[in-house]
Structure formats: C-alpha cells, structure tokens
C-alpha cells in the first residue's frame, strides 16, 4: 500500500532506523543536516517534498567508502604539490604553493556519478539504482557565481554573468608562472569536464554554468616527468569537491 511505502521513508533530525536500506545525511544550504532512512532506491530520496525546488544540477551524493578513497587521493596530491614546490623554488615554486593552498582549503568527497534530477530518475530504471550503505547528499539553490582555480592571480568566486564565455572570465585575471595558456578546464556543476581552447589562435566560445569551476592548469613540461598526470589529479579533486 502507498501508506506503507511512505512510512518506510522517514525524515528526522535524530537517529535513523537500523533496518534502513540506505542511510543518507542531507546538507541543505548550510541548514542543520537531515537524516534519511529507509530509502531503497534513489527515487525514494530525490522525490521527497523537503527537497522540492532544489537545484539538482549542482547536487552531489557520495558514498562512505568512496569518500575515504577520495580523501586519501587528495592528501597524496597535496603532498606531491608540496614536494614539487620545494624542488622548483622561485616563481614556479611559489605558483605551485598557491595552487596547493587552494586545494588544501577545500574538502572532497566520494562523489557518485549518478543523475539526481527527480524527473529523470523516475522515468528510467537505470537512473534509479538501489541505495545500500551510508551516503551524504549536498543540495541547495542555484548559485550566482563561478569559481576560478589553479594558476591564476585572483582565484576564488566570481560573479556569474549569463552569456559570458570562459575567455572573458580569464581576461580578468593574470596567469602565474608555469600556467597553461592555450587551454583551460571547465568543470561543470554536474561533474562534466571540458578542455576549452582559450588562446588567440584556437579560442572557442564556451559558456560556463553557474556553480562551475574554471581551472587553469600547468603547462606541459617536455624535459621532466615531474608534472606528468598532475592536472588530471587536480581535476579529479575538483570534481569531487564538496559544494560550498
């Protein structure tokens, strides 16, 4: 019966049932966290009235063990950047340290690559996986900013302007020593990553969504392997970042 199904999913500020299929802690716009129990499938979570009107494009759901792994990888990255900065010294070392400080200030989680939009979850069975174990969900309202990160003179939040392309955001900052100047990486709030051409000879009109991260990475280094895979590591941490 419908009443039985509804009763199986309980929102509370207290403890949750030990018999729950999935237990989820929900963080909403810096409000007190909610505890959800008894969610058998993703649709049981995202269709709750308490979450109506949420901006699902920027929502992040994570699983406990995946979070442990993501946090461990993030610490490895921070250590690598610290070592590389010490080895390089000078302007390059200072620039690397600025990137490390940005990453050190953020928290990462074991983001699950699933669709969270309630309509899409309900319509297709493959979008409605079972929930088993412990999860965390971050969801809120659409932000009015994007974030610049990486080898830029002024990292952090910038006002989002509809129709404004990536190249225009980058024109408002300087790039630090060792920065890639032909491409930048756009990380949309959905977690999708796009390598965007931004030099005068290859630039393309690409508009970020609100809540996006625009990352200016390290240029390729022909004569050393010290930077191999570094941008990929940083982008991985940025895609697993807990929303502000």
Predicted region positions:
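Positively charged n-region of N-terminal signal peptides that target proteins for export
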Residues: 1-7
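Ser/Thr/Pro/Gly-biased, low-complexity, turn-/loop-rich segments
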Residues: 2, 19-244
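N-terminal signal peptide c-region/cleavage motif recognized by signal peptidases
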Residues: 15-17
């Amino acid at each position: 019966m419908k009443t039985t199904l509804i009763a199986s999913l309980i929102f509370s500020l207290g403890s949750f049932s030990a018999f729950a299929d999935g237990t989820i802690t929900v963080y909403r716009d810096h409000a007190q966290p909610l505890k959800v129990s008894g969610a058998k499938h993703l649709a049981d979570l995202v269709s709750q009235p308490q979450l109506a009107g949420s901006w699902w494009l920027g929502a992040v759901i994570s699983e406990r063990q995946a979070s442990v792994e993501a946090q461990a990888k993030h610490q490895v990255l921070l250590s690598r950047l610290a070592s590389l900065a010490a080895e390089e010294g000078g302007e390059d070392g200072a620039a690397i340290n600025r990137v490390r400080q940005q990453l050190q200030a953020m928290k990462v989680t074991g983001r699950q690559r699933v669709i969270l939009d309630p309509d899409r979850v309900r319509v297709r069975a493959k979008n409605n996986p079972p929930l088993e174990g412990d999860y965390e969900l971050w969801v809120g309202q659409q932000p009015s900013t994007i974030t610049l990160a990486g080898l830029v003179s002024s990292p952090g939040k910038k006002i989002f302007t509809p129709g404004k392309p990536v190249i225009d955001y980058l024109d408002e900052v300087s790039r630090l020593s060792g920065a890639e100047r032909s491409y930048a990486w756009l990380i949309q709030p959905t977690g999708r990553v796009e390598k965007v051409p931004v030099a005068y000879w290859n630039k393309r009109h690409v508009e970020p969504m609100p809540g996006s991260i625009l990352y200016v990475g390290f240029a390729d280094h022909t004569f050393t392997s010290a930077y191999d895979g570094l941008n990929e590591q940083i982008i991985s941490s940025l895609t697993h970042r807990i929303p502000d």
